[in-house]
């Protein structure tokens, strides 16, 4: 190999090393940095009431209120967004404590279905929840569970249940944070439905429950699927590495 060939070979090798390092560095960053999470906190909604089938949205997600399965029309009062600082929020029911912000209330055995506006999939990481007793003054106990049911793009389902916190001495429920990693991992859902159930005398958790299965919900952390363009950019970088490698291997070898 003469001096000129050695020079070209050195430039090619250095270029390949730089491009490989850049592509692998980008891949490492993509692997280390998760997609940006969205937090639904209901702050932009304000105080509102909803009947079954009604919808509202926040931060690129659509929430559809679901009436009780016992409802004949599916259009009954089943949800509301309220301000925890409002002293008149709960005239009969016992509002949760420890939350001075806006939060969602599923009432009268109702539920809430969540999906993305762009119909893409997402994972659910955490949420805060509480029991919404239908009347005040209930003795301290856990009266049921929150149910989280996710539907995947292939039509499968995954479900997780979380016991309601024990009521305090005044009959109000504190909020509790539910981590969903153990139940769902990074499963991608097309939609998630959140509802509640109450224990019956036989120990089963039931819904419908005479319009008494009610819950409060706040600060849902959701992570959308990364945009396809992200993977495309990484693929282009790795393809360029492969191209340079092939060009180098196909180059005629000089005689010594």
Locate predicted features:
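Extended, low-complexity, turn-rich repeat/linker tracts enriched in Gly/Pro/Ser/Thr and Asp/Glu
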Residues: 130-143
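Extended extracellular/luminal ectodomain segments enriched in beta-structured repeat modules
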Residues: 119-126
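C-terminal membrane-anchoring or membrane-association module
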Residues: 243-256
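Bacterial N-terminal signal peptides that target proteins for export
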Residues: 4-22
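N-terminal targeting leaders for non-cytosolic proteins
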Residues: 38-115, 119
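A short, hydrophobic C-terminal helix/tail in secreted or cell-surface proteins
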Residues: 227-246
């Amino acid at each position: 190999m003469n001096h000129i060939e050695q020079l070209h070979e050195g430039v090619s090798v250095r270029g390949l090393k730089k491009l490989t390092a850049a592509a692998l560095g980008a891949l490492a960053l993509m692997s280390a940095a998760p997609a940006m999470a969205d937090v639904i906190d209901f702050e932009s909604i304000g105080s509102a009431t909803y009947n079954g089938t009604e919808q509202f949205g926040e931060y690129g997600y659509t929430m559809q209120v679901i009436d009780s399965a016992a409802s004949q029309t599916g259009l009954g009062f089943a949800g509301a967004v309220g301000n925890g600082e409002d002293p008149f929020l709960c005239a009969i029911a016992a509002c949760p404590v420890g939350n001075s912000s806006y939060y969602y209330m599923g009432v009268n055995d109702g539920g809430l279905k969540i999906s993305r506006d762009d119909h893409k999939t997402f994972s659910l990481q955490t949420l805060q929840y509480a029991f919404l007793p239908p009347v005040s003054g209930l003795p301290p106990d856990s009266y049921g569970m929150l149910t989280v049911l996710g539907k995947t793009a292939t039509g499968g389902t995954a479900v997780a249940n979380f016991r309601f916190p024990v009521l305090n001495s005044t009959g109000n429920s504190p909020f509790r944070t539910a981590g969903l990693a153990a139940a769902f991992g990074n499963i991608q859902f097309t939609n998630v439905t959140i509802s509640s159930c109450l224990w019956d005398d036989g120990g089963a958790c039931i819904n419908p429950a005479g319009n008494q299965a009610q819950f409060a919900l706040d600060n849902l952390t959701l992570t959308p699927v990364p945009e396809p363009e992200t993977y495309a950019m990484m693929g282009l970088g790795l393809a360029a590495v492969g191209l340079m490698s092939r060009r180098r291997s196909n180059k005629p070898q000089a005689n010594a």
